[in-house]
A protein has these predicted regions:
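Hot-dog-fold acyl-thioester-processing enzymes
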Residues: 2-92, 157-158
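Short aromatic/hydrophobic contact patches that present stacked aromatics
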Residues: 95
């Protein structure tokens, strides 16, 4: 990874994620060597690993694997949104979309918008938060969007 480790997200609990809240995640550079190594290992399609084949593809050059883009989003999410004190994981993701190619050298920034936040009916120590996460490139184009479901611990009694 070409970026220094960022500080962990501040301690927040379910109650700190009201519907409509927006969180900026910061940004990360798409390192060309990481694009190549990730694709060689996990997604070896020609437009990710072969410059000549990629030049002839609809993308006109090497692009990052969508899964690599999602992993960059996850780093920003873990460091800027999910509090280690309250994150209890996720039962899944809805509507994962790769909306535009991500190229080596791009700088991606992330934003989280809370769509809903509801206390769990069966487990009173937690809540369920559904968000919209969007990743944009340096031109402002949305390149990735998804709607994860997060389980977050409720604030402990004082």
């Amino acid at each position: 990874m070409n970026t220094p480790p960022a500080p962990a997200a501040p301690i927040r609990y379910f109650e700190d994620y009201p519907e409509g809240a927006v969180f900026e995640l910061g940004s990360i550079e798409v390192d060309p060597a990481e694009v190549q190594s990730f694709a060689e290992r996990f997604d070896p399609q020609p437009f990710h690993v072969d410059p000549q084949a990629a030049a002839l593809s609809p993308y006109g050059g090497i692009i990052a694997s969508g899964w690599h883009t999602a992993s960059l989003m996850m780093r920003l999410l873990a460091l800027g949104f999910l509090s280690p004190a309250s994150s209890l994981g996720s039962p899944g993701i809805d509507e994962l979309r790769w909306l535009a190619p991500v190229r080596p050298g791009d700088r991606l920034s992330g934003r989280v918008t809370v769509l809903s936040a509801n206390p769990s009916r069966s487990k009173p120590d937690r809540g369920i938060v559904i968000t919209l996460i969007e990743m944009r490139n340096q031109a402002g184009d949305t390149v990735l969007s998804l709607k994860p479901v997060n389980l977050l611990r409720r604030r402990p009694p004082a």
